[in-house]
Structures are given as C-alpha cells and as structure tokens.
C-alpha cells in the first residue's frame, strides 16, 4: 500500500517514538538505519503496513476498509448521518457510503503537478514526478548516469541526496528568482538533554520561535514576533542555528565530494 514512494536513501524527519500510534509502538530499527534517532523511512512504511493488517473491527481489518480509486461526487448530511456518493475511477460504478462521522483529508497536493518542458518529447531519458521516484529504476539502472532534479523543496533535496549516494552525477535546478537555495537544511544534532533537533523542536518553548497561527496569541509570542527586541532576539537565534548547520555540513571543505560546496545556502 505505502511501498511505491519509498527508496533506499529516504530518511524520516521524525525520530523514534514520535511517529507511532499509542496502541502499537514501533519496533526500534537496527542501529545502521539510525542517525541521531532519525531513521530510514522504510521502517515507517513497514510499521503502517503491519498496522493496517493487525487492527480489525467487526471482522474487517483497516486494510479491508481502505478503498482506492474512489472519487467523491457529493457529501450530504441527512437525518444526522453522512451520505457520501462516489464513483470508481476504473469502471465508473457508483457506490454510496453512510457514516455517523466524517473526516475530510482533501490531500490538496496529492495530485502530481507536472510542468510542461519545451522539447521534452525529444528528450531520450525518463521524465518523472517525485511521486514515481521510488517505484522507478532511476537509481538502480546502470544506463542512467546523470540526473537533473527540478525544484528546491524537501522532496527535491531527498532525491538529490539519494541520487548522489547511488553514484549518479546530479544537477540541481532552481528558479532564477530563488536566491536562497534549498527550502531548509538543519543540523540533526541535539543539545543538552535532547538527543536531536527534532526533540528540541517538539518542546513548547521551541515551538513558539516560529510564527504560526497554531500558537496561542500570548504576551510571549507577541514579545518574540511583535516587538523590536523580540525580532532582534529571534534573528540572533536563527543566525546561530544557521551558522551551526553550516559548520556541521562543512560545505566548502569536502574535497572528495565534487560540487558539494554548491549546496551551501545563499541566505542573505
């Protein structure tokens, strides 16, 4: 179910114990698949696969209850019940679901947005979206030696990393107007009692360091983001984080990694 988008060098942004359901802890991955308690994403995939198989309600597992290839036509509430009219995208058969509760997870970015590239019909190699990266043979094919990745978000950084680890020659393309490089790079290391950066970020104090509508509007958040002293303090904090990240990455001194210095962010 979840395997198609995974690949060998795909790592999580979360750590052991933070991405599991309370009724089924996730087994700890082997140490070779861990880095400051971040781990290869394939272990989350396996965990979710197992979870859908072992949880059963009224004689049906979660896997039995998941329906793929279904398009929702309408949602109505009649006599206190939800009525969901759907069609199967493969054979156009209609089906109506009835439920006492409805959760909408619209997945606004679940449909791949493929750019139109001039002359792509004359290009001899495969052109794929990140969605198909894991199920493709791009990383394992000996005939594919050069890979170009378009875009600067996390998924692009993941693909660049995976391609380099697979021994490919990689070109990373950004828009001319994008002067800051990849979306976000951060050292995984923790400080004090925290083993990694994720654990620090999950604390209530650290969560207030980034402006968010999710945070409550308190004197503390107004001080940090609404006063000149707070803005100066936050600027100093993030400058320190940026400096430490650059030091850990050592972009400019890895002589055996050609082009690694070009990954250095161009933060103003």
Go through each PLM region and give its residues:
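N-terminal FAD-binding dinucleotide-binding subdomain shared by FAD-dependent oxidases/monooxygenases
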Residues: 1-120, 166-268
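Glycine-rich dinucleotide-binding loop and its adjacent helix/turn
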Residues: 44-47, 104-170
